[in-house]
Amino acid sequence: MRLYKSVRLASITSTWADELIGWKQEQLDNELKNGLLERAESQLLKEFPFLNGISRNISFKVSFSSVVELCYRTTEKYTVNDWENTAKEMENYKNTSDNETSNTPKLYLEDSIWNGLENYQRKLMGENNKRILRLSYIIKLVLFAGWKE
């Protein structure tokens, strides 16, 4: 199941997401030229024969939410030490973008990914923190880690 949640994010987070969207969209466009849609429809009919006689409309879209999911899955096996190093690297990253406004995208993510991000809030908070880390920071960190991969 998927859930919508709105999370206020820093502008640099959108910059990284936009770069990832462009990169992933380029991959998708190449795959579509090579028959991805036809292969997906054939595979779907093979897996679910009852769909024979039913119109199938498949669309593929790269979005802010889909790249958050990509980055989460890419970094899922990170250790706490990996995250600490990534956080330090992110803090030292120099933002060359002039855009300083934040945005509040409505993210549409799988339950398991929301749960994983929320678990990171506690897991990465450190011994000196009195409160859990903000979800916006966790998403920023996950996107940075995926962006630098």
Task: Name each region found by the language model.
Residues 1-47, 55, 87-121, 125:
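Short Lys/Arg-rich basic patches
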Residues 30-86, 127-149:
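Short, basic amphipathic alpha-helical segments that act as recognition/interaction helices
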